[in-house]
Structures are given as structure tokens and as C-alpha cells.
């Protein structure tokens, strides 16, 4: 992994007898509870990262009026979190309040000296919203990158060939029954273009309905390690699982490896039961290149935040060993 060292990455050793993919859950999951602050019923689908020797995060808080918004959280160990009671106060470039009607499923990525928050919001339908901060005190809204409808935007943690790179999932305004991952680039985080298809839903049952970006890609010598979500349909609704892929380092619209099996699927009570049952939804990782430890943060049943662990060498080997890449995934994504 090519990233700054994080020696205090949260960690729990692999349990004996683990079967399937080399990912295991934190035994004290979930790490968020109901009614975490006044006026918020649930916190889930949230993104965290190291900050000033400790940890900071942006959290989807479902308010008691049913409207989701983004709240800031602080932690010394990235497991036990204190949430600010007020939602994040976004402003425009002139310092005037500029608040979306709702905001949910945030991601948090640092590029150079700036932290970027990306979320889904209402802009005449489901759309992508963006903001930037350098101190987690002033949050400046950026222009919406795309017209409706789009979700699951994930920013790469560094520029590639001098450009910002963003994954997204074009969709509809509801519970989208389709969806592929696309790549877009920008010179300035305002104007986006050169859209490329990255990968689509597959014939594998667990991701046969739609897929979407998850945690920010992790730079490695093998390529960009991507944890994403895949969705299947059942007689009881959608099931969300976590998948893994490795994208080309210089041209991430090209998929080098894509695991044919899920890495994590709903099994525990906090994943199977909740506001939206049967959901594991990856949003962030904290990773330490020196030890190879990766902590994965994921939403559980639209009700909780869960934590899982893996080792870099083991998960990359598993993805490569179980890889099935379609011809269109290996193309540059333009027709």
C-alpha cells in the first residue's frame, strides 16, 4: 500500500476457523448505536480517516423527522465515537449558508492538503454533492459535478495524470434496479468529463442487479484496490454485499482483477435486521502500509456502523486468485 503510516489503525486479530474471504468482523460490532445524539435516530453509511494523530469522520445521521444529513464525529481509537450535535454547516465560496435539503452516504477523502466530502443529495432528484475543508470547521460547498441522477461518488486520494478522478454510479431517482460504475476526471473539481465505463453488474448472483463505489480506492503496487458494493434481488428485496476489485494504476477505467465472490455479505443480526434489512455497505477504510492492516467501515441495515478487518497481502491474493474479468472490464471504457 502506498499511503502514510497509521500505526494506531484499529485492529483485531483474525479468528480461528475463518472460512471464505480473509475478512473478519469486529466482535464488538456495531460501533454505533440508536439515538446517538438528540434528534438523530440512527447513524450509518459513514466515512472516517486519520486526523492529527486521532480520527475524524463524516456520518450519515437519519434525523427523527426522517431526513438524512451529515454529522461530524471524533474518536481517539476509530472505534468509540463522539458525534457533534449539529449537522455540518456548509457555506458557499462567499461564506453564505448553502445547505442541501438532505444529504446522505458521505465519503471523505484527502487530496494533497484538502479534505473533500462527497455525498448524495436532492438536486431535482438524486445527485452528487461536494464540499471541501482544511480544518473541519469551515465546509465550503462545491459545484454539483453532474446532472441528476447519480449516486455513490468516490474520489481517488491523489490526482492521476494531473487530474482529479471520481467514480460514480448513474441511476434513477428511486430504488434503482440497475447501475454500473463509471470514471470521470476534472482539472479543478468543478468541470468533469472524459467519462469512462469501469465495470458493470455481473452474472454472479450477489451483484446481478447493480453495483456501486464504496470506500476510496487504496493505492498499491498492484493497482487501485477497490471495495465496492454489489446488489442482488430476492423475494424479500435487495441484498447488499461487499466486493473487491483492482483497477489499473494509471488508467483506472481498466479492471485488472475482479473477485467473482463477495467478500462480505449480511450474516449478523445488525446486518440482517434494521431499517433496510440485509445490507453491508462499504464507505471507508483506514489502512497502515507498514503492517498491512486494513480496517473497513461499512453501513449495516441502514441502522448501524460496522467494522471489519483484513490484511493487504491476503485480500489482494484472494481477489487475484478468484478473479473473473469480462472483456469490457479490460477496455478503456469508451465506445
What are these regions (language model features)?
Residues 280:
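Iron-sulfur (Fe-S) cluster-binding modules
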Residues 283, 287:
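C-terminal substrate/ligand-recognition segments
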Residues 215:
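Catalytic core of Fe(II)/2-oxoglutarate
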Residues 1-101, 109-154, 158-209, 218-275, ...:
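Beta-rich carbohydrate-recognition and catalytic domains
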Amino acid at each position: 500500500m502506498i499511503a502514510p503510516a497509521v500505526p494506531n489503525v484499529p485492529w483485531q486479530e483474525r479468528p480461528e476457523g475463518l472460512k471464505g474471504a480473509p475478512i473478519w468482523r469486529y466482535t464488538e460490532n456495531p460501533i454505533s448505536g440508536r439515538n446517538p445524539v438528540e434528534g438523530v435516530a440512527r447513524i450509518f453509511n459513514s466515512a472516517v480517516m486519520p486526523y492529527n494523530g486521532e480520527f475524524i469522520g463524516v456520518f450519515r445521521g437519519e434525523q427523527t423527522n426522517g431526513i438524512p444529513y451529515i454529522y461530524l464525529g471524533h474518536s481517539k481509537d476509530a472505534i468509540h465515537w463522539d458525534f457533534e450535535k449539529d449537522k455540518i454547516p456548509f457555506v458557499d465560496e462567499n461564506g453564505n449558508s448553502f445547505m442541501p435539503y438532505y444529504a446522505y452516504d458521505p465519503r471523505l477523502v484527502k487530496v494533497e492538503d484538502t479534505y473533500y466530502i462527497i455525498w448524495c443529495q436532492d438536486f431535482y432528484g438524486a445527485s452528487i454533492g461536494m464540499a471541501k475543508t482544511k480544518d473541519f470547521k469551515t465546509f465550503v460547498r462545491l459545484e454539483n459535478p453532474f446532472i441528476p441522477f447519480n449516486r455513490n461518488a468516490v474520489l481517488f486520494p491523489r490526482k492521476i495524470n494531473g487530474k482529479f478522478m471520481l467514480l460514480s454510479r448513474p441511476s434513477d431517482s428511486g430504488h434503482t434496479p440497475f447501475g454500473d460504475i463509471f470514471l470521470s476526471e476534472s482539472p479543478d473539481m468543478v468541470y468533469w468529463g472524459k467519462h469512462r465505463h469501469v465495470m458493470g453488474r455481473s452474472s454472479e448472483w450477489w451483484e446481478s442487479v447493480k453495483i456501486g463505489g464504496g470506500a476510496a480506492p487504496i493505492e498499491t503496487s498492484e493497482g487501485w484496490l477497490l471495495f465496492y458494493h454489489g446488489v442482488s434481488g430476492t423475494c424479500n428485496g435487495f441484498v447488499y454485499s461487499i466486493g473487491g476489485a483492482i483497477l489499473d494504476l494509471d488508467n483506472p477505467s481498466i479492471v485488472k482483477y475482479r473477485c467473482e465472490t463477495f467478500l462480505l455479505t449480511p450474516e449478523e443480526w445488525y446486518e440482517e435486521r434494521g431499517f433496510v434489512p440485509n445490507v453491508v455497505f462499504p464507505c471507508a477504510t483506514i489502512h497502515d502500509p507498514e503492517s498491512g492492516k486494513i480496517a473497513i467501515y461499512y453501513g449495516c441495515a441502514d441502522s448501524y456502523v460496522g467494522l471489519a478487518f483484513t490484511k493487504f497481502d491476503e485480500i489482494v491474493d484472494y481477489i487475484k486468485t478468484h478473479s473473473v474479468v469480462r472483456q469490457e472490464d479490460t477496455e478503456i471504457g469508451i465506445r
